[in-house]
């Protein structure tokens, strides 16, 4: 599995996940509309969203755009 790993909206930096990491995720703060920073990466399970945070998980290559 390969996931995107950069914080910008348009990301093309790809990371190969380790064994056991079968999920790509993207999370961001729903309050910040301007200058939004995304946290992307690989995970074994989908990270839990904190208050006012949006987390999206998927399981195909580069799906966390």
UniProtKB/Swiss-Prot annotation:
Family: Belongs to the three-finger toxin family. Ancestral subfamily. Orphan group II sub-subfamily.
Record keyword Transmembrane present: no
TM annotation in the entry: none
Record's keyword annotation contains Secreted: yes
Pfam families named in the record: Toxin_cobra-type
Main location: secreted
Other comment: Negative results: does not inhibit GABA(A) channel composed of alpha-1-beta-3-gamma-2 (GABRA1-GABRB3-GABRG2) subunits.
Organism, as annotated: Naja oxiana
Name the record gives this protein: Oxiana weak toxin
